[in-house]
Amino acid sequence: MQDTTANQVAANATSSFTEHLQRNRPGLLPYNQPFPAALTGAGSQPLQVPHATTIVSLTYGGGVLMAGDRRATMGNVIASRHIEKVFPADSYSVLGIAGTAGIAIDLTRLFQVELEHYEKIEGTLLSLEGKANRLGAMIRGNLPMAMQGLAVVPLFAGFDLPVGIGRLFSYDVTGGRYEEKEHHAVGSGSVFARGALKKLWRPGLTAEEAVAVAVESLYDAADDDSATGGPDPVRQLWPVVYTVERSGARRIPDHDLASVAGAIIEARTTARREA
């Protein structure tokens, strides 16, 4: 009896936690939740739910960095000034989310469990390419929700240990995966953030310089995009910033970000810059 049970467990074993849920409890997947026809049918009004906005990522001399603002919007209303949109996926990769906040955060948690499950089953880390591909498959699974207006568009970045460099990947709503060089941004303020990144980024940045570039690009995005929140000295709210190097992922402390944001604001005030 015990041997039979063990054989059944072995036969159903998979290194993918998402695949395990799909086989056994598909209703637990974030994108397998049915919506009433009144909410999704023809002529229905779009759901008013919080949306996460701008994420930026860039490579530098020692690895890769990702940063996100702290604002979530719901139509023309600020839904939150405290939301976090950048998360560690595992010890050597980070994930930033733009789009429907609730679904994006659930997908992030599922992705974190997916990588942890793989490591426990296989006894080794999944390669960076493998992580990027699995995230793409999850986004593709969310396509029916995206077609109902509940899209999730992530940025993924990590340190490729065998190669010894930081890499970053963007996605579309169908799960298409695209490796980006140098820097990238997603979300409502991404057009303005990319413009700033093009001017500020250069090869061989130090980690400190990369943090300053990321914060200033978010500052520029917030200046022109009402859905993006800039550094807020009054509330002491700063972007969420992670660096990923050979030593692993690390969150930049708020006191460091306060100094960086303060220097940017002071420089622009001194220069009397209008924009």
From Swiss-Prot:
Chief location category: cytoplasm
Regulation: The formation of the proteasomal ATPase ARC-20S proteasome complex, likely via the docking of the C-termini of ARC into the intersubunit pockets in the alpha-rings, may trigger opening of the gate for substrate entry. Interconversion between the open-gate and close-gate conformations leads to a dynamic regulation of the 20S proteasome proteolysis activity.
Keyword Repeat: no
Highest taxon listed in the record's lineage: Bacteria
One Gene Ontology term of the molecular function aspect: threonine-type endopeptidase activity
Protein name per the record: Proteasome subunit beta
Pathway annotation: Protein degradation; proteasomal Pup-dependent pathway
E.C. number(s) listed in UniProt: 3.4.25.1
Entry annotation: catalytic residues: T53
Species for this entry: Arthrobacter sp. (strain FB24)
Catalytic reactions on record: Cleavage of peptide bonds with very broad specificity
Pfam assignment, any one: Proteasome
